[in-house]
Amino acid sequence: MLYPEQNEARLKLSLDGTWAFALGSCVEDQFDPAKPLPDAQPIAVPASYNDQNDQTTALRRHYGWAWYQRKVTLPTFCAGQRVVLRFGSVTHTAKVWLNGQLIAQHKGGFTPFEADVTALLRPGETVLLTVACDNRVNHSTLPVGNEDGQLAFFGSDNAGIPSVEAAKRAAAPQNRPNFDFFNYAGIHRPVVLYTTPKEYIEDVTVVPAVDGTVQYAVKTTGSAPVHVTVLDADGNAVASAEGTEGTITIPEVHLWEPRPGTPYLYTLHITCGADVYDQTFGVRSIEVRGTQVLLNGKPLYFKGFCKHEDFTAHGRGFDPVLNVKDVNLIHWANANAVRTSHYPYAEEFYDLCDREGILVMDETPAVGIGGGAAVNPYKEYPLAEHHRQVLAEMIHRDKNHPCVVLWSLGNEPDLEHFPQDAYDYWHPLYELAHQLDPQNRPVTLVCCQNDYTKDITTRTMDIVCINRYYGWYNLSGDMDAACYGLNQELDFWAEQHKPVMMSEYGADTVAGLHTAGAEMFSEEFQVEFYRRLDAEFDKRPWFVGEFVWNFADYDTVQGPMRVDGNKKGLFTRDRRPKLGMHFLRQRWSEIPTFGFKE
């Protein structure tokens, strides 16, 4: 599925704006999609619906289906064209109707889906577009939610007290996420109608090599001849070829590198009969060799942020202004990488990272797989098929982005209590990722704080990625003990003879809270936390990167462990730097992207 673009052969019409909206229930087809929604209110698209109306808590606490509706008119000048309706993402399960006819269904809230509506939407005609989305998370969704009667992440219930148990049975149904971020829902990314000629370019794959050779494959629906031209950054043609697949050689090739290097981009200009499509790409290599990660043959050190798509009012909704601001703050911080915790981000963000030279660890929404020793998720949760689906959709969508240098299969599953079952679940996904990716990028799985000696899965990944909270959730506030514990664990990982990086670590920090000593939750403690742990990373030549948790404060489910969300951000939710960010900015200014541990 190609990203929609507008050119001399294709038209793209935005359907973003204000739609009609109504909350439903857990009944799947509660409303008639051929009729106007009852008691509809206005809602903005794209955006989460949860925080758009503070006159009521109903949107914030909604559990079940929510309904969107608007009218759509196709211009008469689209006659003779193929017409496609595309959604960037709808969270988590979606159904779409035109004039009451079901045209699309999709499970998974973070990747695009589309439907050919040529036969249903005639030029000059106005139709009723209805979308229903289900925000419920459970043991069959990714991310995972707990079933009724179980706790949400960081919840509390004093289990066993009769009055509490009775109240739980009487309580209204609600989402109980097994993850530490708010379960925002709705039409989160752009909605477009786009056109193509009847015979069209369906897919493009580009596999460049640093010697300038570029393998390409173009999938089309007709028999029209295919012509491809490589354009340099100035739009000059530098190579060309004929046919749906082949190899092109770029003379005097410019490589793509993260800043402060040059993120040089080429364009593969494709024509097929009346259709035209432009696919940008960068020429770079990424590989693991021994205990090093090599980009263009040079040892790489990741200086990165874990992020969330999260902001006030629009929740997880697509925001190009915020994306640009965040990328500029990443540059300001002297960082070079982002981890898309814990789901694939909007496609436009990857385009920006391509242009701006920011490395991306691209992660599936597989977070929350595990419930402790009492539950074997690999035997009891029906997740494997859906997991393969979301992994395939992510890789297919993002395969041509030079910024993407690492696939993450998921975040913090239970790898300790059922180690063989965990390996049997995750290793086929590891193999599938390598099979699906034409560029064969490294693959990892982000593991949580556990008995790492029992974890037989993480050590099999191309890069060992560990989430650790020494000094915060473990050995809280005692940084001497935290460093001792960290070093003992790092000695274990050294024996695996693989590159290792910290994929998540951090400390909740209340902006403006200062203490004479470095006390927990203060800005001073955040500085001390990073200063002490980072010094230990620097002693290990096989330690190849650090992704701090988190770029900015973000919203979570309410509970006794969270006060207005997670405060581990280096920036506040409105993007003001904390003291710890100034420390990291200085640290990262002294660490080169290449050759740091040589």
Where are these regions (language model features)?
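Secreted/periplasmic carbohydrate-active enzymes, especially glycoside hydrolases
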Residues: 1-347, 352, 356-360, 390, ...
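Substrate-binding clefts and catalytic carboxylate motifs of secreted carbohydrate-active enzymes
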Residues: 7-31, 171-172, 179-186, 193, ...
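Feature marks short, surface-exposed loop/turn motifs that line or immediately flank catalytic pockets
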Residues: 91, 135-137, 287, 308-309, ...
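Short hydrophobic/aromatic-enriched beta-strand-loop microsegments
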Residues: 106, 357-364, 462-468
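The substrate-binding groove and active-site-proximal loops of carbohydrate-active enzymes
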Residues: 109, 176, 180, 308-321, ...
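Catalytic metal-binding/acid-base residues of hydrolase active sites
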Residues: 134-136, 343, 365, 410-414, ...
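Short low-complexity, flexible loop/linker segments enriched in glycine and/or proline
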Residues: 145-146, 352-356, 375-380, 384-387, ...
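Proline-centered loop/turn at the N-terminus of a beta-strand
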Residues: 357-359, 365, 440-442, 499
